[in-house]
């Protein structure tokens, strides 16, 4: 068979015409070293700070150090199989996480991937984990309450929507219990919740999720889990991921509550990353920007005005303000609030709830130290009835602590001192509350009214808890309308005062406690 040169030329032409070449401009680099989850990359010329770098096997690293000849990046996940000479690509994207209503009721990791075995999540969209906080003009003052369900907090240290209230204390003082109860109390308030677990045991996170499910609060809560077994990078970024998920609701004119449990472990994870990246250490070996680490996170919790919401939603939502309330948790060592991270977070937040080991061990739970706990903006958000009735609670407790210390040395006390001590004891006893038993505004008002108006003077100290329990069931059955009215309006006037007085006098006659 003889080949014709024209046929060959024609075949070659056809082949050339069919040949498709697709070219893409890609910024590639080479791994120079892998050490403790940190990779140094040569050749990524146009890399952004915080950019996602694509690694083999559908994994990513985040570029944190941009140096003259190399990029220092921290690997998100396992890194044992990465080797020198491996090619990596820059994506041109900052880390984003899924957001939306579909995340409610789910447990996700730092990257927003479900880890609860309930299938994939159809997100409404993706948002960057690092965002700039709303400016001064876009904010609105805090004047609506977040009810935690705790008498001691809602009466003395009230939290408002859009506030940052720090929960601080040693280990095993009930910090997580307080935050979880605050979430449980929001199940009927319309406030969406985000619980961010940083550096905790998987068993602890599982127990929290189980409790939220038991009390029906999981369906309006997102749990973001970065357990102790996760890499330092995922623990450091978890708080920002959770904040982005909470901001979704804030920016659409809804109210959200976020708990960071806890920021001490986040700071330790960030210190680990910074030291591995060879950044110069400062006080307690923390890097110089550890204040900025927490301030840029907590400033994103805010109450935004209706104009901001309208602009953000392109006019779909009008006349509604949005809020993100933050309850960051800090663990202290032997009550040392003057350490680096605690002082930083105290100065950033709008107040703190200080929990004490001695109070906790003596059976006063929640173990709130009323003397040093403060809410800097919550007073204007407090419910009227609680504000009016609860004014004397803090004073009674402060005087009681002072007099109790003095009374140890004095043998005979005058009548006024003795009555102050007895009143303080009763207030202290009444402020005790069991876990997972949050109270409504009306229930709190009744209890506080009883102690403030002297109805507990003739009740023995060890009977006060029983007295309160019987009183609440009596009010629920006999005065349901009054309780519903107080819950609905939160108002306090002469009529309500008279009704409460009559109710308590009637209850005292029953002697049913």
Curated annotation (Swiss-Prot):
Gene Ontology molecular function: ADP binding; ATP binding; proton-transporting ATP synthase activity, rotational mechanism
InterPro entries: ATP_synth_asu-like_sf, ATP_synth_asu_C, ATP_synth_asu_C_sf, ATP_synth_F1_a_nt-bd_dom, ATP_synth_F1_asu, ATPase_a/bsu_AS, ATPase_F1/V1/A1_a/bsu_N, ATPase_F1/V1/A1_a/bsu_N_sf
First-level EC class: translocase
Protein's cellular compartments: Cell inner membrane
Keywords: ATP synthesis, ATP-binding, Cell inner membrane, Cell membrane, CF(1), Hydrogen ion transport, Ion transport, Membrane, Nucleotide-binding, Translocase, Transport
Known catalytic reactions: ATP + H2O + 4 H(+)(in) = ADP + phosphate + 5 H(+)(out)
Chain sites annotated for binding ATP: 169-176
Classification via Pfam families: ATP-synt_ab, ATP-synt_ab_C, ATP-synt_ab_N
Primary residence: membrane
SUPFAM superfamilies named in the record: C-terminal domain of alpha and beta subunits of F1 ATP synthase, N-terminal domain of alpha and beta subunits of F1 ATP synthase, P-loop containing nucleoside triphosphate hydrolases
Quaternary structure (record): F-type ATPases have 2 components, CF(1) - the catalytic core - and CF(0) - the membrane proton channel. CF(1) has five subunits: alpha(3), beta(3), gamma(1), delta(1), epsilon(1). CF(0) has three main subunits: a(1), b(2) and c(9-12). The alpha and beta chains form an alternating ring which encloses part of the gamma chain. CF(1) is attached to CF(0) by a central stalk formed by the gamma and epsilon chains, while a peripheral stalk is formed by the delta and b chains.
UniProt function note: Produces ATP from ADP in the presence of a proton gradient across the membrane. The alpha chain is a regulatory subunit.
Name assigned to this protein: ATP synthase subunit alpha
Organism: Idiomarina loihiensis (strain ATCC BAA-735 / DSM 15497 / L2-TR)
Higher taxonomy: Bacteria, Pseudomonadati, Pseudomonadota, Gammaproteobacteria, Alteromonadales
Gene field: atpA
